[in-house]
Amino acid sequence: IIMSPISSVAQDTLSLTEMVTALTAKGFDEKAAAVEALAEVGEDQIEPILEALLEGRLYTRKNDGKVLIVEKRDKIYLLFDPVELTEVGHASKKEITKLRVNNRLRRIIRSALGRLTLLSPDPAKRMEAAGVLFQKPSPANASILAAALERETDTAIRSKMAKALAAIQLGPQNPVETRIAAIAELKAFVEPEVRSLLSALLIQDDSGAFREQDANVRAVAKRALESIESKLRLYGILETLFHGLSLGSVLLLAAIGLAITFGVMGVINMAHGEMVMLGAYTTFIVQELFRTYLPGGFDYSLMVAIPLAFAVSGFAGICVERGIIRYLYGRPLETLLATWGLSLILQQLVRTVFGPTNREVGSPSWMMGAVDLTGGIVLPYNRIYIILFSITVLIVLLAVLRHTTFGLRMRAVTQNRSMAGAMGIRTGRIDMSTFGLGCGVAGMAGVALSQLDNVSPNLGQAYIIDSFMVVVFGGVGNLWGTFVGAMSLGLINKFLEPYAGAVLGKIFVLVFIILFIQKRPRGLFALKGRAVES
């Protein structure tokens, strides 16, 4: 009596070991049967065995035929018992043979793993299992999926399970009423993969005959498909709108500093893109310091990088204005050539210090991931934050220009330079501060762009032309015009891309702006200033 439980446990372990050994069968049909038998056991030990088989980590030892899970460490293969998961030694590559699987067997293993993980205490595993079972609907999974659905309490996982169960019930082996009810269930899921599933019911062969024989099922599927496609078109427009606003926010960040230097001061600063680049490299340096000295605070690195990038690029802008620009006011060609040469110098300087290759700038944890909405719409967190950041920068700049003494003096110099000087305003200092402000804002743009683009010496070149287009289109010297221009060009670009492609779309936008400024030379929102008066 005392020994009987021990004998029972030994017998169970022995039978499980025999079932694992059955995976060594030569035929794939026999292997598939062994996988199904293991899945029926439903014990915790089964999942790592099937995962090892799927990932190519299940081997047999040549001298005794024992099945083992193998982990490679350098040139040594560590051996683990598949049932107990204990290390039993090591071997060379010549002493073991991998268990082979084909695509059909992989599908069976994934389906079996899906059934095993449906009842897992881990919500992420249950969610993943429901997704796998939807991709590979099998009548064998219907009962366990229905049981899992009854006990599931998480709303999102219940929705996934209901979708997977409806996909199984849609199969031709079910009664017509069950299939029609499954279509009604699937109609609520406005997703491309559901559309593909229903579209398969309406496929015709070469003779014109439908794959789906029942006319009622086809009619219901057609109505559900039309409803899903109309909603998907709407969601597609909304997603394009988001990407247009995202591109517009990037253009706004890159152009808003140029709107100050070019729009307000009338200075053609071809080195503006390099001020953006300096901000991006400042972000890289800050993150490297955090990684080295304060790895636990990496999530705060961008918060530190924003004011530092503003200071670095702003100081560089002040040096440029005092050293070069102030001697070239009223000479636009010389200013353009001087700043273009400066941009080449800054690029080469960065190549010398940091090297010509791209530098890695990481994203903090709160900017990683995305909002997954219905209809397959995915809104990345980093782009959402950049949209909010660009609007915040615009509002702060507007407040500075309208409600501070510096802003009042800057507007006075812009509207009537000689009168402002006569009133005691030091116009030279205002020029210096204004140019520094514009370059500092460009540096903050570099912080944001480092989360989207490669940080390299050529980073700024990709945005300088677009920035000038935004400023000219929106209206020289008007920040609201820059905002409207950036968002308009971002939306136009994204709505043109599906039809004309990215490159041809930009060409169309450029032609549109050229034609537009023939009609309105001062842009959408005209503003009088030094550049206009001259």
Where are these regions (language model features)?
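Transmembrane alpha-helical segments in multi-pass inner-membrane proteins
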Residues: 302-303, 307, 432-447, 451-513
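Transmembrane helix-bundle core of multi-pass membrane transporters
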Residues: 335-403, 430-433, 500, 530-534
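Single transmembrane alpha-helix segments in multi-pass membrane proteins
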Residues: 241-286, 319, 323-334, 473-476
